[in-house]
Design a protein with these regions (language model features):
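FAD-binding core of FAD-dependent oxidoreductases
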Residues: 34-48, 52-56, 63-88, 116-138, ...
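C-terminal auxiliary extensions adjacent to catalytic cores
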Residues: 1, 5, 9-27, 53, ...
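Well-ordered mid-protein domain cores that form the structural environment of catalytic cofactors
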Residues: 71, 89-112, 119-130, 135, ...
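Glycine-rich, flexible loop motifs
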Residues: 1, 5-30, 57-116, 207, ...
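Generic structural signal for alpha-helix starts
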Residues: 49, 73, 96, 453-454
């Protein structure tokens, strides 16, 4: 999404758009069709005279550009524009092909509409945020271009682009749909998948530090439960740990018949935050798969209203703009990521708590105890951030509030849910960054860098290149930020 350039569309794509537009142009001549010759929402009972039809399309854009709050980051706006474009390419909206081409130019040239975060109730889709996008397509409002917020008109002129001129229903088509929540959701999913990979890797490295027995990730144990996610997480852990000299084989020690101790010095079973990784992250994996399915379905759907269908020669009125699928999925996604974050926070606690791990100095402090403090204060950040994730995990899906003269008497709140999931994911990266800082410091405390698995060694070396071992106290906020950048790079290749 961040760097993509969309190709010029194929003839079949253009043909589908033209067929839809031409059919609607003829079909709508002598009929009452919502949003073409009627008002919008509860004002649909009012007929619009022919001489005002074009003005009607401009009015919905200008009247609904009422967002508030911080601007949505450019990456997420770009994703929303791609999602809206895909809706039009279904050929069910009756829009002129020039609209799709102009959106493509915006995306490819990095012209990103200013879109405030707040305003959508998720039905009729993301009206307010999409109106801000539509406002720029008609040459009004503001855009971000080459790092600067500017008036749209000057940016269009600079790029030799003309504002879009309304034909039949393009004002309604741009504003009416689930594209903002879907775009945010897709970016959320990409970051969440990357985060899950790190959670797996960090968990392997934690067990290397603890010198755990490795049977908790074995195929026979995890195959005894019929959950794809659990089995896949265990497989990923087995792949990561290959070549490690740190983890232990139960068969070589506890099963060799030579133990006569009354009290075992090494843990027979480690804490749940080390041992139950497949069972904890398995549902997260399964949820990511389901979220991917829902978002792919949504982006390849016509989430407009009404739906223009040249095949059946009809126009259908309904509610494809309703964002329930995305809303429900974003709620589930933030719950999954919060659980992942809670796991990371507990692993941090294991590393930092010398009376629990029994092998490391307090807070992986390699300096003078009492005089120096290691990563002690970073735990405050991880704990408070995890707590925020837990609160944000309460669902938006069931927080419908009637509005719009009760025309929208039950809504999805899908964009709110997607934005909350975005915050949860960002928080999770902060906690994961602190965990990875603790892990590499622990590896140096124990002097086991040459014994961990080759994959763990690669990560260790990459991190130590920008976060060297430390003994003296220095501010760590910049290192946390650098670690987050590293974690988001996308170095994993999923099967």
């Amino acid at each position: 999404v961040q760097t993509c350039a969309l190709p010029i569309f194929s003839d079949p794509c253009m043909q589908k758009l033209e067929e839809s537009f031409n059919f609607l142009k003829t079909f709508s001549n002598d009929k009452i069709i919502y949003g073409i010759n009627t008002g919008f929402g509860p004002m649909a009972q009012y007929r619009i005279e022919d001489e005002s039809l074009s003005q009607l399309q401009y009015n919905i854009i200008r009247s609904h550009a009422t967002g508030a709050g911080q601007p949505l980051p450019e990456l997420y706006v770009k994703a929303a524009m791609i999602a809206r474009l895909y809706t039009f390419l279904q050929g069910k909206s009756g829009v002129h092909k020039e609209l799709a081409l102009l959106i493509t130019e915006f995306i490819n040239r990095g012209i990103i509409p200013y879109v405030p975060e707040h305003g959508s109730v998720g039905a009729s889709g993301d009206l307010v945020q999409l109106a801000h996008i539509a406002l720029t397509l008609i040459g009004e409002g503001e855009v971000f271009y080459q790092g600067t917020k500017r008036d749209t008109a000057s940016v269009l002129a600079e790029n030799g682009l003309q504002p879009f001129q309304m034909h039949i229903r393009e004002g309604l088509s741009v504003t009416n749909g689930t594209s903002v929540m879907t775009g945010i959701g897709i970016v959320n999913l990409i970051y969440a998948r990357q985060l899950m990979q790190w959670a797996v890797g960090a968990s392997v490295m934690m067990n290397e530090i603890a010198a755990s027995y490795d049977d908790f990730m074995s195929e026979p144990l995890n195959g005894a439960k019929q959950h794809e996610g659990q089995q896949e997480i265990a497989r990923m852990m087995r792949q990561w740990v290959k070549g490690s000299l740190c983890v232990r084989k139960r068969e070589n020690e506890l099963y060799n018949g030579k133990h006569e101790e009354k009290i075992f010095t090494h843990k027979v079973q480690p804490y749940y935050s080390l041992r139950c990784i497949p069972q904890i992250l398995g549902p997260v994996y399964d949820e990511l798969l389901n979220a991917e399915k829902v978002l792919i379905n949504e982006i390849n759907s016509a989430c407009d209203n009404p739906i223009v269908d040249p095949d059946t020669q009809n126009v259908y009125h309904g509610g494809n703009f309703h964002g329930d699928y995305v809303s429900f999925e974003m709620d589930k996604l933030k719950i999954a990521v919060t659980k992942l974050t809670m796991l990371a926070e507990r692993q941090i606690n294991y590393l930092f708590h010398d009376r629990i791990n029994g092998i490391l100095p307090p807070f992986v402090n390699m300096g003078v105890l009492g005089l120096n403090y290691g990563l002690q204060a970073s735990q405050f950040t991880a704990t408070s951030t995890t707590a925020e994730c837990q609160t944000l995990s309460n669902p938006m899906y069931v927080h419908s509030i009637p509005n719009n003269n009760d025309n929208q008497d039950i809504v999805s709140m899908g964009t709110n849910s997607a934005l909350m999931a975005k915050t949860v994911i960002e928080n999770a990266y902060q906690v994961m960054a602190i965990l990875m800082m603790g892990i590499v410091q622990a590896i140096d405390c124990l002097d086991i860098a040459d014994r961990i698995s080759p994959r763990s060694q690669q990560v260790y070396k990459e991190i130590r290149a920008f976060f060297p071992v430390f003994r003296e106290d220095t501010p760590k906020y910049k290192e946390i930020e650098s670690m987050m950048v590293y974690l988001k790079k996308g170095r994993f290749q999923e099967k």
